[in-house]
């Protein structure tokens, strides 16, 4: 079984994740990916797209140009054979759908959490993607577990 993780060169803020990979002996390379931020080398089954905050995800899903880019990225992943596209949202405060529903941001005051949750649910239905909230300290382990299907 192939255990080499590829991390996209455009993925920012991944220093702690790569340090975790080093700590646990997880092999990885940094290389440009066609879709997402993390995957197993030559295995497109599972692709992970990491978001640093729920606000980043909201911006991606609610901005028309960004939303179209995300849709193209998911379509590209599926063309490559991806059957498990996962958005990993790094957030220490959000724990549940109810927390997303009650979410608000001063940066996007017109977007209510309830609307964001509906958009996420529509994406789940339309594109068969998953959304997972993960704490910053657990991000590296979660990426390995999802890609290695532990």
Where are the regions that the model predicts?
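Conserved catalytic cores of phosphodiester-cleaving nucleases, focusing on short active-site segments
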Residues: 46-53
């Amino acid at each position: 079984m192939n255990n080499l993780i590829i991390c996209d060169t455009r993925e920012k803020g991944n220093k702690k994740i790569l340090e975790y990979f080093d700590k646990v002996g997880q092999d990885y390379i940094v290389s440009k990916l066609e879709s997402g931020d993390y995957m197993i080398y030559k295995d497109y089954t599972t692709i992970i797209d990491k978001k640093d905050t729920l606000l980043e995800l909201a911006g991606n899903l609610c901005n028309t140009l960004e939303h179209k880019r995300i849709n193209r990225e998911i379509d590209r992943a599926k063309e490559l054979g991806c059957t498990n596209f996962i958005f990993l949202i790094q957030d220490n405060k959000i724990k549940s759908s109810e927390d997303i529903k009650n979410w608000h941001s001063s940066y996007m005051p017109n977007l209510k959490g309830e609307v964001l949750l509906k958009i996420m649910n529509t994406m789940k239905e339309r594109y068969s993607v998953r959304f997972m909230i993960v704490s910053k300290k657990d991000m590296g382990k979660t990426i390995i577990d999802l890609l290695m299907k532990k």
